[in-house]
């Protein structure tokens, strides 16, 4: 019975509800849905998540990617998320009255942006405490509505719906603040929330605390223009043509905010106006390159990576090369990601155990990484637009790399100990902050070239030299080389000019290389970045991972290479400054460029210039902490030459001014004068080379030591600069830029060559003018004792044309003229020195023959040596004139360039038949760069030596002739030689030339008598290496020859090459050893040709001057250990 009333009550309530539901079924359903939606936001946190998923961002007016939220949570854990879910800025239901702020249409509309004159931000924070009270109130009102309905049998749903209306103002607390305002919000759950209003360029944000400081949570834009707007780079704030209504400062053309052309100034003018150096050279070039890159990668409407957010969702990105490639690669990248997901799924299915969680995390991070940096992440899933994507290359990679090039180099550039050209303390606009590096470079180049003379002179006298004692109208930063150019120009001595200009030319050359290398690095980064959609997906698979690693390594290398070059320049500058300026310190002064105002017709210029000058305030302990620093600066060559009058004045003032004053008290004259060190130094003392006053000697010594230091520095830096590109590439494990950029020594070498040519021309003109006519020309070509002065030998009986193309007995002196007959000369085998006489032959042969004197012994000439002495039939030449010519040419070896490289052709003649000719088809690199080309040149030289050995062996065995002898038998030596030679011909290394059957040599062979042929046949197997004043023959490792009277000594070459050279050092050592071998062979051949090098000397042999010189050179090689003689004749096979 106790349960009966309770059961009846439950049955009545259920029947009431069911009946009520049948009556108002549709109305109840809508009301229940509204209640369920409201109950899903039981707390401020759950309500914030619901708003984030179902509506637009309510916490900010500026849309941000989800990736940003994840990053911010790492920077500010817990605090950021709690503030993020409770903050409300973009909510029209809240901000529509005076309490929260009246913003018709919503707080985030264009018309309701923050006024820059009153930068106040309105926002609200959700309170869980008030939310609990509001929800309790709704439950109470719903219960009352149900009770009312039960008693009155009315419809309760309208009352329930009204009770559960989302009254946001009941549980939100309004705030307002300007930049700098902060406070705390207290609540249930997470008890304290710290907030602060900050300004970030053209936006006002509500922030909270994080590891890196204030972390923005929700932001709102300010109206433009305002003093520090990011749009100042694109529009002229003072130009009213862009403003439709001056009262609200609204631009009439919104695209003007992101249009580079609206500014009215090009890239050059922008960089020039932002530069702080007096002479602007490099920064406009870099700025134009950066703008070109921004237009190429982002859009034609932007000039900087700082404004990429302005065109993210615009169709103007269609002009971007990177964007077009990304669109084209979209399906390919999607295919890569699909394959990666499939492979990972197969791995999970086929694995015997569950993979660790780290693999799942790695899987997800790889997909996000590849998508973000290859084609971009779609920030709006409901929108399929290609323009609405987050691109990691544009937002992170390119700004980091391109700004990092200048940033890293700028750290090094401003590390100069003297304080010269330091621009890091000057404030630049953020968009052009990189110009500090190029201002420092321009300042350095202008300083060392003396281009900043006028500007420094103006600031020197305007800001520092106000009194007469310190006034120096000759004070300017002219470099010391100026004082060498003046006497060089007056005296005409080009050596002084070369010495004076060597350092500034090296500075220009290295600076040009730095600018060129930086530009090439920027362009290379752009090319690699555009290919990111191709290389980034290769990160997914182990098989293609190496391609991605190489791509990243190249990007980092191009980032670091300019820093390495700048480090070298700073080292060069610092050593030079210390050598010339000692411990002098520089001060700077920022002045307005009034000169440009006058040049522009009185229009006021906005550009300020930073001027540097030597600080001669010796009492400034911040820069000169001790007296040694002061004395080092005063006694430096640079300071004395830059400040000549000031130096002389201070010297006289410190040492003489007190002497003129009256002597104090009863002090004796000797005691009074003993206080002045200047007078005690006037006495004569020993100098470096002669007696001189001590004071004068000290000054000369300082100058001399400074010059030695500067020259030594120049020598070191010059040699190191030749390998600067390779050094930078090796340090960064990248590609050297010397093949695509100007070489560090290019300008220096070109200028030095021009100066050398100018000096040679000046010297030649002076000699011709002093000696007159032909004598000067004859001395210039080194042909003394000849009959005529005709340099080209185009007329006359005998000319001075010296053709150094063969050379055995003497130089091949080709004489042409109207009275002479074309001649060809052949040598004899009778002696080591051929004596010649003239003989005329008919037109069928048309050659001159040098016939031998009578001799009982015939020694055949070595076949690899071609000795021709063409002479004329002119009766004006005596029989001894040829010997005199040979002797004069030997004495003037330095004037006649007869030390050419190893010949690529060998043209030889034989007593019996003419030798064939051949050409060597392999060609070395003229200016080898890199290990590969150096190694190829070494291989070509080795191949040339092999060819020459094979050719000499072929000729020595009786082969290699156009027409063989009738009675000649083919020996085994000749067969082997011909086989080896044919291998070179078949491989294409050499090409034979046999089209000389009717040559002079073969016609001469038909004219020779039988007795000569029999003598040659008798001695055809004897090899006699005759080297008669010929430096053009190819090197041999050994020369084992015999003479009829005494055998030659044997020797061994003691230097050994690396078998498999690795690295530049071993390749260079091998090249040096080969050069040393050539030098040894030249010395040996000269020794043998002069009659030396025998085991037993010939009886009655006379030692000539030539032999004495040859033996001296050979003995030096023996003493140095390069070669070792074997005079016991045990190893000489021919003795």
Curated annotation (Swiss-Prot):
Residues 1-28 form the signal peptide. GO terms for biological process: protein secretion by the type IV secretion system. It is found in: Cell membrane. InterPro entries: Conjugal_tfr_TrbL/VirB6. It is a multi-pass membrane protein. Pfam families: TrbL. GO terms for cellular component: plasma membrane. The chain crosses the membrane at residues 332-352, 359-379, 393-413, 495-515, 522-542, 555-575, 700-720. The keyword Cell membrane applies. Keywords: Cell membrane, Membrane, Signal, Transmembrane, Transmembrane helix. Belongs to the TrbL/VirB6 family. This is Uncharacterized protein RT0032. It comes from Rickettsia typhi (strain ATCC VR-144 / Wilmington).
């Amino acid at each position: 019975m106790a349960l009966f009333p309770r059961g009846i009550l439950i049955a009545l309530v259920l029947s009431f509800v069911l009946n009520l539901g049948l009556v108002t079924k549709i109305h109840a359903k809508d009301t229940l849905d509204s209640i369920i939606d409201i109950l899903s936001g039981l707390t401020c946190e759950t309500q914030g998540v619901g708003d984030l998923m179902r509506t637009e961002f309510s916490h900010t007016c500026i849309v941000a990617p989800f990736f940003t939220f994840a990053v911010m949570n790492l920077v500010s854990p817990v605090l950021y998320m709690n503030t993020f879910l409770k903050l409300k800025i973009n909510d029209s239901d809240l901000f529509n009255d005076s309490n929260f702020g009246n913003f018709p249409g919503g707080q985030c509309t264009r018309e309701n942006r923050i006024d820059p004159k009153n930068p106040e931000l309105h926002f609200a924070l959700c309170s869980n405490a008030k939310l609990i009270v509001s929800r309790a109130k709704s439950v109470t009102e719903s219960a009352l509505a149900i009770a009312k309905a039960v008693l009155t049998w009315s419809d309760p749903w309208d009352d329930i719906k009204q009770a559960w209306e989302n009254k946001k103002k009941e549980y939100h607390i309004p705030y307002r603040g300007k930049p700098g305002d902060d406070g705390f919000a207290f609540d249930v759950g997470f008890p304290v929330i710290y907030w602060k209003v900050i300004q970030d360029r053209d936006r006002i944000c509500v922030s909270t605390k994080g590891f890196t400081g204030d972390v923005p949570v929700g932001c709102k834009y300010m109206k433009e223009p305002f003093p520090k707007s990011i749009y100042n780079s694109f529009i002229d704030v003072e130009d009213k043509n862009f403003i439709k209504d001056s009262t609200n400062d609204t631009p009439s053309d919104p695209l003007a905010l992101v249009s580079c052309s609206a500014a009215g100034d090009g890239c050059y003018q922008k960089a020039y106006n932002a530069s702080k150096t007096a002479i602007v050279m490099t920064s406009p070039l870099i700025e134009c390159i950066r703008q070109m890159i921004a237009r190429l990668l982002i859009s034609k409407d932007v000039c900087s990576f700082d404004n990429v957010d302005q065109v993210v969702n615009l169709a103007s990105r269609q002009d971007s090369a990177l964007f077009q490639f990304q669109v084209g690669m979209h399906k390919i990248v999607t295919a890569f990601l699909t394959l990666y997901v499939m492979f990972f799924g197969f791995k999970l299915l086929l694995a015997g155990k569950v993979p660790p969680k780290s693999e799942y995390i790695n899987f997800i991070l790889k997909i996000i990484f590849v998508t973000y940096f290859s084609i971009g992440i779609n920030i709006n899933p409901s929108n399929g637009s290609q323009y609405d994507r987050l691109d990691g290359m544009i937002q992170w990679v390119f700004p980091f790399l391109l700004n990092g090039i200048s940033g890293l180099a700028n750290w090094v550039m401003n590390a100069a100990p003297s304080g010269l050209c330091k621009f890091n303390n000057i404030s630049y606009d953020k968009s052009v902050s990189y110009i500090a590096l190029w201002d420092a470079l321009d300042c350095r180049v202008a300083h060392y070239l003396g281009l900043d003379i006028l500007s420094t002179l103006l600031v020197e006298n305007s800001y520092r030299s106000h009194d007469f004692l310190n006034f120096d109208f000759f004070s300017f930063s002219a470099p010391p080389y100026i004082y060498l150019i003046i006497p060089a120009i007056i005296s005409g001595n080009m050596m002084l000019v070369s010495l004076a200009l060597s350092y500034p030319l090296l500075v220009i050359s290295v600076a040009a290389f730095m600018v060129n290398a930086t530009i090439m690095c920027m362009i290379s980064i752009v090319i690699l970045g555009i290919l990111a959609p191709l290389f980034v997906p290769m990160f997914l698979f182990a098989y293609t991972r190496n391609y991605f690693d190489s791509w990243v390594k190249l990007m980092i290398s191009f980032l670091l290479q300019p820093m390495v070059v700048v480090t070298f320049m700073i080292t060069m500058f610092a050593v030079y400054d210390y050598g010339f300026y000692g411990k002098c310190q520089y001060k700077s002064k920022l002045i307005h460029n009034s000169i440009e105002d006058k040049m522009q017709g009185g229009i006021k210029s906005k550009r300020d210039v930073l001027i540097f000058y030597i600080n001669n305030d010796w009492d400034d302990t911040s820069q000169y902490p001790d007296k040694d620093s002061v004395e080092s600066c005063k006694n430096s060559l640079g300071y004395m030459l830059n400040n000549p009058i000031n130096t002389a004045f201070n010297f006289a003032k410190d040492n003489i001014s007190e002497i003129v004053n009256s002597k104090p008290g009863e002090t004796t004259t000797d005691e009074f004068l003993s206080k002045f060190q200047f007078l005690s130094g006037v006495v004569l003392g020993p100098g470096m080379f002669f007696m001189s006053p001590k004071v004068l000697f000290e000054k000369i010594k300082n100058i001399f030591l400074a010059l030695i230091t500067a020259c030594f520095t120049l020598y070191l830096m010059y040699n190191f600069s030749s390998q600067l590109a390779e050094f930078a590439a090796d340090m960064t494990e990248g590609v050297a830029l010397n093949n695509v950029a100007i070489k560090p020594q290019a300008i220096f070498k070109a200028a030095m060559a021009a100066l050398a040519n100018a000096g040679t021309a000046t010297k030649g003109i002076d000699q011709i003018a002093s000696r007159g006519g032909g004598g000067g020309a004859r001395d210039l070509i080194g042909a003394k004792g000849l009959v005529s002065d005709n340099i080209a030998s185009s007329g006359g009986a005998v000319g001075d044309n010296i053709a150094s193309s063969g050379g055995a007995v003497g130089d091949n002196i080709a004489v042409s003229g109207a009275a002479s007959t074309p001649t060809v000369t052949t040598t004899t085998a009778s002696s080591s020195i051929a004596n010649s006489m003239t003989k005329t032959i008919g037109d069928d042969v048309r050659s001159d023959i040098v016939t031998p004197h009578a001799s009982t012994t015939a020694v055949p000439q070595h076949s690899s040596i071609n000795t021709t002495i063409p002479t004329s039939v002119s009766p004006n030449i005596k029989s001894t004139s040829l010997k005199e010519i040979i002797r004069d040419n030997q004495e003037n070896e330095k004037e006649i360039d007869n030390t050419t490289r190893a010949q690529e052709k060998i043209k030889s003649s034989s007593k019996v038949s003419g030798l064939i000719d051949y050409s060597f088809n392999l060609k070395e690199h003229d200016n080898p760069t890199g290990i590969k080309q150096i190694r190829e040149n070494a291989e070509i030289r080795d191949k040339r030596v092999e060819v020459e050995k094979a050719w000499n062996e072929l000729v020595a065995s009786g082969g290699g002739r156009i027409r063989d002898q009738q009675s000649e038998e083919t020996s085994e030596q000749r067969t082997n030689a011909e086989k080896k030679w044919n291998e070179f011909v078949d491989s294409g290394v050499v090409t034979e030339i046999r089209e000389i059957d009717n040559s002079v040599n073969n016609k001469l062979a038909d004219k020779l008598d039988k007795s000569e042929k029999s003598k040659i046949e008798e001695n055809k197997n004897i090899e006699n290496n005759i080297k008669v004043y010929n430096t053009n023959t190819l090197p041999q490792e050994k020369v084992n020859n015999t003479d009829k009277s005494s055998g030659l000594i044997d020797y061994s070459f003691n230097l050994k090459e690396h078998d498999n050279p690795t690295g530049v050092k071993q390749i260079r050592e091998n090249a040096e050893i080969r050069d040393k071998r050539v030098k040894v062979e030249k010395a040996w051949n000269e020794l043998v040709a002069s009659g030396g090098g025998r085991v037993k000397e010939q009886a009655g042999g006379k030692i000539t001057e030539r032999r004495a010189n040859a033996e001296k050179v050979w003995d030096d090689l023996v003493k140095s250990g390069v070669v070792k003689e074997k005079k016991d004749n045990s190893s000489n096979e021919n003795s």
